[in-house]
Amino acid sequence: MTLWLDPVCPFSWNTARWLASAADAFDVRLMSLAVLNEGRELPPPQRARMSDSRRVGRLMAALGDELGPHAVREAYFAFADHYFDRSAEVSDKLADHVVHAVGAQRTTAAALDDTSYDAAVATSHHASQDAHGSSAGSPLLTINDHTVFGPVLTGVPEPGEGSDLLEAVRVLVGAPQFSELSRPRNHP
């Protein structure tokens, strides 16, 4: 199972925490909302988020390059815990925390602004889109070579509910006839 995510997407954080509680194992790979939205006119708050997306994507790519793809999951959880749950801004201080958390020796906070990692981020992003079969946002989930957008979760299910949700998603993703399921994020 592979979770493709943009590190600054709040819905991806919910999905990642759900999978961590419900799945035996899953990989985390990068997709990039910054790459997805290249060339589009965006309002200022979204432009700022895309800047964070690009910078954190570089850091994750650098850590993956140094430590291997497994490090991206650990780095993501170290980052997201501070970024989402503690409202930390993308900064050298946060990057240093992530680098230290995964035990990197070569990667530093300078990776946030190192454009040499942009190609690796773009390559991973395009792999996510290829796995999905069309343009899609974050998160994407691959189960048994079938990739879907989502699930978009507005919170993290309780442990028993999380296991049930994972089984339901596995069944849906595995059904060749299944295409899409959606409801408003603010449903009653």
Question: Could you tell me what each predicted segment is?
Answer:
Residues 19-20, 92-188:
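C-terminal cap of thioredoxin/glutaredoxin-like
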Residues 4-7, 13-95, 168, 172, ...:
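Structural alpha/beta surface segment adjacent to cysteine/selenocysteine redox centers
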